[in-house]
Amino acid sequence: KLVDTANFDDYMKALGVGFATRQMAGLTKEISFKLDEEFDETTADDRHVKKLILTLTMGNVVSTRTYPTTI
């Protein structure tokens, strides 16, 4: 569980992480979900989508987003 992000930007900068990626990292938030159950998500650009998170073998995780269709 994330407790503190003090100096995280400086840390990423020291690792050579680019500006845009560092800015996106600052937008991360904790989520709670159950595997194989779809849930609502709001993307970083404020779109509302359905998301499904599936697991694969060897600890790899795959997620899919379903964007609403407009007519």
From Swiss-Prot:
Annotated Gene Ontology cellular component terms: cytosol; nucleus
Keywords: Lipid-binding, Transport
Any one GO molecular function term: long-chain fatty acid binding
One GO biological process term: long-chain fatty acid transport
PTM entry text: The N-terminus is blocked.
Family the entry assigns: Belongs to the calycin superfamily. Fatty-acid binding protein (FABP) family.
Function: May be involved in the regulation of smooth muscle contraction by transporting polyunsaturated fatty acids (e.g. arachidonic acid).
Name of protein: Fatty acid-binding protein, smooth muscle
Species annotation: Gallus gallus
Highest classification ranks of the organism: Eukaryota, Metazoa, Chordata, Craniata, Vertebrata
